[in-house]
A protein has these predicted regions:
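N-terminal phosphate-binding or glycine-rich loops at protein starts, especially the Walker A/P-loop
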Residues: 1-47
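Short, glycine-rich nucleotide/cofactor-binding loops
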Residues: 7-19, 149-159, 300-305
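Short beta-strand segments
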Residues: 10, 39-40, 62-64, 105-107, ...
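Glycine-rich phosphate/diphosphate-binding loop of Rossmann-like nucleotide-binding domains
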Residues: 18-20, 32, 36-38, 43-44, ...
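Phosphate/nucleotide-donor binding subsite
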Residues: 55-100
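A short helix-to-beta-strand connector/capping loop
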Residues: 56-62, 207-209, 294-295
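Glycine-rich phosphate/nucleotide-binding loop
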Residues: 117-144, 224-228, 232-341
Length: 342
């Protein structure tokens, strides 16, 4: 029998809370029997949302009442310290105390990043936990690491990102010997800023990863690499541009297919193929971005996430747990640290 995974969902985080997180929780426990969802937030508000649903396994949704909410504009470090009874802090503490295996939130990115490191804690040997979302490509998906957690990363941090990303892609996505590339302004080794130039030789010499060199932004959608390594500023720009282009592309296609009678007739013929193609550009299909290298599972979804994205993030947590991703990353980093000490 499969292990039951307890996933905390921040019911108060995001633009569409509490309706969408609660809906996601109901859908998740209805679809799968190996999940218990713990909703953190104001109990009366959550119960009111739950009352809108019927015929779901109520015994697998729990509520932990909290009295505070961390807003997006609040300074993250101060908010984590001051708002001990917030839905984010309480949820992360449940993971820390091993009363849950994972935490999912659409709330304040800064608070989740700070709280993940301060409350849940980094695995031994991990210097900087990166945010690592999957992005669609012509060949499937690639992992973009880091996309927002470490703006001032150093070369050794990027090397660790490459290692963690390789473990993720091999064990979660199932890609053997995943290709690792560093984002650069050209394919040549001598190109790039100081960070890229210092990191490149370290990645070349790094055992255990399949480093293929630099990748330019235009080649990312083609799927030339499985693990895309960069510091957070670059990664976040790539991610936001990717999502913006995907959204615009979908709107343009829909508008073009509806502009006249001839186009509408043609649309009926190609609708199934277009629908399937457009689905691959929908960020909600890929769940959230895990904060890798922690002692517990923490996944950040978009602030505007709907139930479908949050539900997929919950399922993501189950897969992470089953594949023991955190344990594998921790073991690799401890092995690396021990090797250096020796």
């Amino acid at each position: 029998m499969a292990e039951t995974v307890r996933v905390v969902v921040d019911a108060m985080g995001g633009d569409n809370a509490p309706a969408e997180p609660v809906k996601a929780a109901v859908e998740a426990v209805t679809e799968r029997e190996d999940i218990i969802v713990i909703l953190t937030g104001r109990q009366d508000v959550i119960e009111n949302e739950l009352s809108k649903f019927q015929n779901y396994p109520k015994e697998r949704i729990q509520i932990v009442n909290t009295s505070e909410v961390i807003e997006t504009a609040e300074p993250p470090v101060l908010a984590i310290r001051k708002k001990k009874d917030s839905s984010i802090v309480v949820g992360l503490n449940l993971v820390k105390k091993q009363e849950a295996e994972a935490f999912v939130s659409s709330g304040s990115s800064g608070a989740i990043l700070v709280g993940g490191q301060v409350i849940v804690g980094r695995s031994k040997g991990v210097q900087r936990p990166p945010l690592a979302p999957l992005i669609p490509t012509q060949k499937g998906v690639s992992l973009l690491i880091d996309c927002g957690a470490n703006v001032d990363a150093r070369p050794e941090h990027l090397v660790q990102f490459a290692k963690m990303g390789s473990i993720y892609m091999e064990d979660v996505v199932g890609i053997k010997n995943p290709r690792v590339a560093i984002v650069n302004i050209g394919a040549e080794e001598e190109k790039g800023n100081a960070l890229v130039k210092e990191t490149f030789p370290l990645l070349k010499e790094c055992p255990g990863i399949n480093f293929i060199g630099s990748i330019e932004a235009r080649d990312i959608p083609a799927g030339y690499a499985d693990v895309i390594v960069c510091e957070a500023f670059v990664g976040n720009v790539i991610l936001k541009l990717y999502e913006g282009l995907g959204s615009t592309f979908m709107k343009m296609i829909k508008t073009g297919l509806m502009k006249d009678t001839r186009s509408k007739v043609g649309a009926l013929l190609v609708k199934p193929a277009i629908k399937e193609t457009l689905k691959t550009f929908d960020a909600s299909e890929y769940g959230g971005a895990p904060l890798l290298g922690l002692k517990g599972l923490v996944v950040k979804t978009h602030g505007s996430a709907r139930a479908v994205e949050i539900r997929h993030a919950i399922f993501q947590c189950v897969q992470f747990r089953q594949q023991k991703i955190n344990e594998k990353i921790a073991a690799h980093m401890v092995e690396e640290t021990t090797g250096k000490e020796a």
